[in-house]
Regions:
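Primarily a tetratricopeptide repeat
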Residues: 40-43, 47, 353, 387, ...
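Start-of-helix register in tetratricopeptide repeats
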Residues: 59, 333, 367, 400-401, ...
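Non-catalytic protein-protein interaction scaffold segments in large eukaryotic complex-forming proteins
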Residues: 96-99, 107-266
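Alpha-solenoid helical-repeat scaffolds
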Residues: 202-396
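Conserved structural position within tetratricopeptide repeats
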Residues: 357-360, 390-394, 424-428, 458-462
């Protein structure tokens, strides 16, 4: 354990370094404190949470939060550490970054889902497509289209291709995931972590620097617009993946490498302005946190000696599970924002906790009540869902969407009388709707009112329609 004087020396030493070295040293402190809890080192992390260097601050904030999650019970004996962590939320900038960090923690848990989507659906669909012809250079068109997709540029031709709608839908989903901040590059780069460069733990956390001897041959001096540099600046690459890309290029014969770089250059020619705009976006604070979390995910999931480290991604990442973290951000606005975020992720049970907490602090509105009800409905609790839908209906009467959800809940509970009431209200709003007529007929059958049901089905038959299952 450090004494205060030793911690002060380490702090002074770190502050004298360049920004990239500071960032690397803060990551080293995080790994150290993961292995052996040290209150002095935690105070050091809290200090760097307030630095003006964005890259350093993001690493210190991540380390401070994860360390608290790991050692929450010990913090009872160090009230100054809990207070120091709580005080971060008094700074509006840091409070915003804590929210970013919470969201990025949760997005990181979807990495495996994105990887399965690529490996099990998109790649096989591409390989089966007759529109991609193999030649001596490989699946050129496939690689170009996939690269566009991963950059967020959908190919309009996909939807025109016969039988390719599922492929287009899958690609759009992956594009949307990437835009939300979900890591869609893990599968591509996981095979590129076997280079000797990554045998050093430090290299998994080293900020990318094109002047490093291991990669400088990829960036020869005198080239004003290096295509690889432009690609790295504009792409959603974390620091570790940038090194992987350079290591891979270093393995290629110089003549082939030059040809590949030339091809990349020709593809981005004319799009320099757009790439510069994307590069500016990649420098914002959200991108800094996203990039670092991706570096961490790769280290804890792919490092050859990963079992020797405590994997923070295996812990519960929701701040509401931890006393101090919950108290730091417990405002109605934050609770609503996180509830909506969790709903988009289909984490309905956790979204309920956030929304019900928000309802304790502010007057309910129809939108919030609808969201709570929807979450209960999707966690197989239709009775609770109906309770909130009924309240929402009082605030927003004759709402077609609410009535649709209510009839589904009543149907799930076998309460066919109330289901019929909802269906008839919907029919008044949508006279002649085939599906509604069919649903009403089926509901009447459940109630044993067969003659009325038959009249509904005759109505469909008369109009040349059939019962919609």
């Amino acid at each position: 354990l450090f004494h205060a004087a030793e911690a002060e020396k380490l702090k002074n030493f770190i502050e004298k370094q360049e920004t990239d070295e500071q960032a690397l040293l803060v990551s080293a402190v995080m790994l150290n404190i993961q292995r052996y809890f040290d209150p002095q080192k935690y105070r050091l992390l809290l200090h760097f949470c307030r630095t003006e260097h964005t890259k350093v601050r993001a690493r210190a904030m991540t380390a401070a939060v994860w360390t608290y999650m790991q050692y929450e019970k010990r913090f009872v004996y160090y009230p100054d550490l809990s207070d120091g962590l709580s005080l971060l939320a008094q700074d509006e900038r840091l409070k915003g970054e804590l929210i970013l960090l919470q969201q990025q923690f949760l997005l990181s848990l979807e990495t495996a889902k994105a990887e399965r989507k690529l490996q099990n659906e998109i790649f096989p669909d591409l390989l089966r497509s007759r529109n991609y012809q193999r030649n001596k250079m490989g699946f050129e068109q496939m690689e170009e289209d996939l690269a566009k997709a991963l950059r967020g540029e959908p190919n309009a031709e996909w939807e025109k291709m016969r039988g390719n709608k599922q492929l287009a839908d899958n690609m759009k989903e992956i594009i949307a995931m990437g835009k939300e901040g979900i890591d869609i590059n893990l599968g591509t780069f996981s095979a590129l972590k076997g280079f000797s460069f990554f045998q050093s733990v430090a290299h998994w956390f080293t900020p990318f620097n094109r002047r490093r001897p291991e990669v400088k041959s990829i960036f020869p001096p005198g080239i004003r617009h290096n295509p690889i540099q432009m690609l790295m600046e504009a792409g959603n690459f974390c620091e570790s993946d940038k090194y992987s890309l350079c290591m891979m290029l270093n393995q290629i014969a110089p003549s082939q490498r030059d040809m590949m770089i030339s091809q990349i250059g020709s593809q981005i020619e004319g799009n320099e302005e757009g790439l510069r705009d994307v590069a500016k976006e990649s420098m914002n604070i959200g991108s800094v946190y996203r990039s670092y979390l991706q570096d961490l995910y790769r280290f804890f999931k792919l490092h050859p000696r990963k079992t020797q480290f405590d994997d923070p991604f295996k812990r519960d990442q929701l701040f509401t599970r931890y006393t101090v973290l919950e108290s730091m951000l417990k405002t109605p606005a934050y609770l609503r924002e996180m509830a909506s975020f969790l709903m988009k992720r289909e984490c309905y049970q956790d979204a309920i906790a956030y929304m019900e907490e928000a309802l304790k602090h502010e007057t309910a509105n129809a939108e919030m009540l609808q969201k709570v009800a929807f979450c209960y409905q999707h966690t197989d609790r239709p009775s609770k869902a109906i309770y909130y839908y009924q309240q929402a209906d009082l605030l927003s009467p004759n709402n077609e969407w609410i009535l649709k959800q209510m009839y589904l809940c009543y149907s799930a509970l076998g309460r066919y009388g109330q289901e019929l009431d909802c269906l008839k209200s919907l029919e008044e709003m949508n006279p002649g709707d085939t599906r509604l007529i069919s649903e009403i007929g089926l509901c009447l059958m459940q109630l044993g009112r067969y003659e009325e049901a038959a009249q509904r089905f005759y109505e469909l038959e008369y109009n040349g329609e059939r019962v919609v299952p």
